[in-house]
Amino acid sequence: MPGCSRRAGLGWICLTCGCGLVAVASGFFLPHWLTGCLPPPLWYYGRTIACFIIGGPSSAEESAVSSNDRVVAVANLKGGVGKSTTVLNVAGFAAKAGRRVLMIDTDPQASLTQVTLREDARPTVTLADVLRSRAASLEGAIIPSVLPGVDLVPSSLSLESVLNQSLSLEGREYLLAEALDPHAAAYDLVLIDCRPAIDLSVTNALTAARWMLVPVECSFMALDGYEHVMALAERLRKRINPDLTLLGILPTRYRSGTGHSQEALKAIDGYVAQAQPALRFQPIRLAVAAADAPAYGQSLAQFAPTSAVGREYETVTGQILAWLDQEVWR
């Protein structure tokens, strides 16, 4: 359920509401100061915050958190800007840092799946199967990827037809969110790779996510897809997912020696200043290593961790993880 925070463990679960009362059982309310739960601020009426009354873990690290607090959708409606490359490398460096990572490929072209699927893997369940059956979980679809410590929900060409068949379904925007919900708390980072389109796959990704990361190529017409994905995100915030927040705009394929790349970066900086995202990133350079790593089924964390572009992606990953750690337990 979007906007709902939960804690796992023993004890009564209570839900805070905008009036400052806390529901500890059906039809039974207590003032928030008796329960230890804080009422939400006035701008956040309607959000439910789960907390413990009795028992439960003694520290925040031992408790589950809001199901989508660590879910990041990597989206841009322009192709070729580095969405899959960003997912691949952020996942690789996050896992190298000891984090539990899940990648979800929502693109029917399945580029991320092709790169990260193990040679001996024969997935019997893909994201298409999950959405087709309106499954309550991703059980069976989550498999180990070729990246150490990173799991994958693979995509397939059949996802296209499933998306078309789902257009008339009630609640179609929540298919991925509902399936991901039982698993999200098991990971420190969930990355959703989005296709460059306005369709049900992207809508599902942005509904399931708490954060949106937008890679933007430092080139002519760089911001073509940015405004469209931001407009889509704003519509979803109003209708479906009020928690969706811009994590950052990531400049990619930067060539410092070219004037048009520098001009594009200035334009991107202008959009960053206007959008005020949670994080600001230095540009990711255009580099051979970033193009070669996927050909070997590796992220830069394995292929060229000390290269300049590898260090840049590692820095981006560190920023993201530090922000999520701070936000989840705020």
Segments from the language model and where they lie:
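Extreme N-terminal basic, low-complexity initiation segments
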Residues: 2-14
